Curated annotation (Swiss-Prot):
Keyword Ligase: no
Site (Required for activity): residue numbering on this chain: 362
Species this protein is from: Ligilactobacillus salivarius (strain UCC118)
PANTHER family: ATP SYNTHASE SUBUNIT ALPHA, MITOCHONDRIAL
Reactions catalysed, as given in the entry: ATP + H2O + 4 H(+)(in) = ADP + phosphate + 5 H(+)(out)
Keyword Magnesium attributed: no
Entry protein name: ATP synthase subunit alpha
EC number: 7.1.2.2
HAMAP family: ATP_synth_alpha_bact
GO cellular component, one term: plasma membrane
Assembly with partners or alone: F-type ATPases have 2 components, CF(1) - the catalytic core - and CF(0) - the membrane proton channel. CF(1) has five subunits: alpha(3), beta(3), gamma(1), delta(1), epsilon(1). CF(0) has three main subunits: a(1), b(2) and c(9-12). The alpha and beta chains form an alternating ring which encloses part of the gamma chain. CF(1) is attached to CF(0) by a central stalk formed by the gamma and epsilon chains, while a peripheral stalk is formed by the delta and b chains.
Keyword tags: ATP synthesis, ATP-binding, Cell membrane, CF(1), Hydrogen ion transport, Ion transport, Membrane, Nucleotide-binding, Translocase, Transport
């Protein structure tokens, strides 16, 4: 049998053509400790802070502590499949989450994985969870209002698009209700809402989602949930994941409202991780960089300049206080980062004043510039009315022989408190808020009994919807008050038809 050189060369060429170089170089280390949501590994000498690493079982982790001998890693998910001695390799990537319109209407975990049983989220866009906040020249001042639908907020502590407004109060004072009502009120406002539930019970999150769905608000809302049974790393990452999802819309010229409910639990999760990673504890055992934990998150909320599309992200961070102590470490940190705070008072809540907003300690540092002109006009005296009422109320309990001016202030104060009450999940459009506050500040409610205020208000709205829709539309479209003669005449017309209760 003769060997032909051509056949051999053809065979060698074919072999060379089919050869694939599948050699890859991975930098791998060895797990030396695993437990409590963290792992330690040595051999990853070139790992970067915040870099994703992959364990043998496919679980990902994030490098946090870079020490001379080993790397402290927080594990993103269950750590049950990871053993001491397993290998762990660098990925060269930082953590990213899925983003885009496909997430709207879904409930996802902080990794962007759906947990609502409605199938996978079909998006191929991702964004890093950590991103540098827009700089000074990339922003513009807050000029557009964000209507919450709650009279007490829109009149006394107005919020603008791009603002950070802290909602602070003890547990069970209606903080989550403020968030849900604000989201419901964004319907038809060209706003995308993101509700980040951190450490909230799964049953509570489910109730909130059902409420949003009932009012049609899930059509423009993303819910990011990290329940109390989630590992601490997921509770720590949840707000950053929500911010990354919001930035996708903000940088595309859209308006976003993001609610962090609540950042106290995120700080607790971060404290837990830091102590397990053996970082030195500081005040209240929080690590030294707990201020930076919240500042780098909240600075990502902004009103972007027109060159960048003019989009905005408004943040409503929540903080839970213990026995009304706003001077604790985390509350004072977040108060100093945000553009104002809404303080919810448990005494007011239990006395039936809901939403339980304390007008004396609540403030909005930039929202006044964004307030509708009509609202600014009618709400101008509200804060002073409430302040003088609360001052006089304590004196009034000791005696009834008060002069007429004091009695008038007390009567106006009682009616102001009553007008600012609002039922759950019934946010009001701004024109109706302006209408009832106009009636209050111009003395039309002074002859009405305090118990009749809310029925009077409901009747007034129905009457204007039926007979004076043009006046309401004028407020809604122009943001200014109609001619006072017309408005006064219309309110007097209604007052003549109002039937007071027989009490």
């Amino acid at each position: 049998m003769s060997i032909k050189a051509e056949e051999i060369s053809a065979l060698i060429k074919q072999q060379l053509a089919n050869y694939q170089d599948e050699l890859t170089v991975d930098e791998v280390g060895t797990v030396t400790y695993v437990g409590d949501g963290i792992a330690r590994a040595n051999g990853l000498d070139n790992a970067l802070a915040g870099e994703l690493v992959e364990f043998d079982d496919g679980t990902y982790g994030m490098a946090q502590n870079l020490e001379s001998n080993d790397v402290g890693i927080i594990i993103l998910g269950s750590f049950k499949g990871i053993r001491e001695g397993d290998t762990v390799k660098r990925t060269g990537r930082i953590m990213e989450v899925p983003v885009g319109e496909e997430l709207i209407g879904r409930v996802v975990n902080p990794l962007g994985q759906p947990i609502d049983g409605l199938g996978e989220v079909k998006t191929n866009k991702t964004r890093p969870v950590e991103r540098k906040a827009p700089g000074v020249m990339e922003r513009q001042s807050v000029t557009e209002p964000l209507q919450t639908g709650l009279k007490a907020i829109d009149a006394l502590v107005p919020i603008g698009r791009g603002q950070r407004e802290l909602v602070i109060g003890d547990r069970k004072t209606g903080k989550t209700s403020v968030a849900i009502d604000t989201i419901i009120n964004q319907k038809d406002q060209d706003m995308i809402c993101i509700y980040v539930a951190i450490g909230q019970k799964d049953s509570t999150v489910r109730t909130s989602v059902e409420t949003l769905r009932k009012f049609g608000a899930m059509d423009y809302t993303i819910v990011v949930s990290a329940g109390p049974s989630s590992p601490a790393p997921l509770l720590y990452l949840a707000p950053y994941a929500g911010a990354a999802m919001g930035e996708e819309f903000m940088f595309n010229g859209k308006h976003v409202l993001i609610v962090y409910d609540d950042l106290s639990k995120q700080a607790d999760a971060y404290r837990e991780l830091s102590l397990i990673l053996r970082r030195p504890p500081g005040r209240e055992a929080y690590p030294g960089d707990v201020f930076y934990l919240h500042s780098r998150l909240l600075e990502r909320a902004a009103k972007l300049s027109d060159e960048l599309g003019g989009g905005s992200m408004t943040a409503l961070p929540f903080i839970e206080t213990k026995a009304g102590d706003v001077s604790a470490y985390i509350p004072t940190n977040v108060i100093s980062i945000t553009d104002g705070q809404i303080f919810l008072d448990s005494d007011r809540f239990y006395s039936g004043i809901r939403p339980a907003i304390d007008a004396g300690t609540s403030v909005s540092r930039v929202g006044g510039n964004a307030q509708v002109k009509a609202m600014k006009k009618v709400a101008g005296t509200l804060r002073t009315d409430l302040a003088s009422y609360s001052e006089l109320e304590s004196f009034a309990q000791f005696g009834s022989d008060l002069d007429e001016a004091t009695q008038a202030k007390l009567n106006r104060g009682r009616r102001t408190v009553e007008v600012l009450k609002q039922p759950l999940h019934k946010p009001l459009p701004v024109e109706k808020q302006v209408l009832i506050l106009y009636a209050l500040t111009h003395g039309f409610l002074d002859p009405v009994k305090v118990d009749d205020i809310l029925p009077y208000q409901d009747g007034l709205f129905d009457y204007f919807d039926a007979n004076h829709k043009d006046l309401l539309d004028e407020i809604a479209n122009t943001g200014k008050l109609p001619e006072t003669e017309k408005l006064d005449a219309a309110i007097k017309e209604y007052a003549a038809t109002f039937q007071a209760s027989e009490k």
